[in-house]
């Protein structure tokens, strides 16, 4: 059986990762991984990606084709674009409905496996010492705080140990991020990825809105 000290530390590490990355990002990542597997929505998700690329390509070709100079080509591209957009919107609506159900289930499981497990451990082991401190090492009131709420006096409780783990993990993460920025002179990979995703979403929205007006 793993040490309770290690279990609490790993649990706090998972909570820190989820809070840093963001619950929505975790849900999106799991949704992408879910669609990589042979699931009921994997085919629709792959088709949506293909349609998304086709819409951007067709919109670009439409912009480069003059209806006055080459109307037949422009009309053909316009029909293809409208057809792809209609199919994409239909599939996207269906996928969003499935994703909402998936996200709700994942959020429940994630909460039970992190916050819920933490509450259970803190309640179940509230009277158990994580470890003992040398006698007389700290004043009485410090011993009382470290054993809060119900651990034996002179020991460190699971609540205090969890707080200590969370603080150490947070400080280590901030130090690592600061060193990364100082050494590479670049934003952290997480910040760079969020910026890239934001730019891609804005680019697709810019291509989609004019098409909706044409419809």
Curated annotation (Swiss-Prot):
GO cellular-component term (any)? GET complex
The protein's matches in InterPro entries, at most eight in alphabetical order, are given as: Get1, Get1_fungi, Helix_hairpin_bin_sf
Residues on Lumenal side: 1-4, 132-155
The main location is endoplasmic reticulum
* Protein location: Endoplasmic reticulum membrane
> Where exactly are the transmembrane stretches of this chain?
5-24, 111-131, 156-172
The record's section on Pfam families has:
CHD5
The molecule here is called Protein get1
**Classification via PANTHER family:** GUIDED ENTRY OF TAIL-ANCHORED PROTEINS FACTOR 1 (PTHR42650:SF1), TAIL-ANCHORED PROTEIN INSERTION RECEPTOR WRB (PTHR42650)
| Taxonomic superkingdom | Eukaryota
Q: Which UniProt keywords apply?
A: Coiled coil, Endoplasmic reticulum, Membrane, Transmembrane, Transmembrane helix, Transport
One Gene Ontology molecular-function label = protein-membrane adaptor activity
Signal peptide residue numbers = none
Intervals, Cytoplasmic compartment: 25-110, 173-215
Query: Which chain positions lie within coiled-coil regions?
Result: 45-96
Annotated region Disordered: the residues are: 192-215
Under the heading Gene3D superfamilies, the entry gives:
Helix hairpin bin (1.10.287.660)
Summarize the protein's role.
Required for the post-translational delivery of tail-anchored (TA) proteins to the endoplasmic reticulum. Acts as a membrane receptor for soluble get3, which recognizes and selectively binds the transmembrane domain of TA proteins in the cytosol.
What family, per the record?
Answer: Belongs to the WRB/GET1 family.
Its membrane topology is listed as: Multi-pass membrane protein
BP term (GO), one: tail-anchored membrane protein insertion into ER membrane
Q: How does it assemble?
A: Interacts with get3.
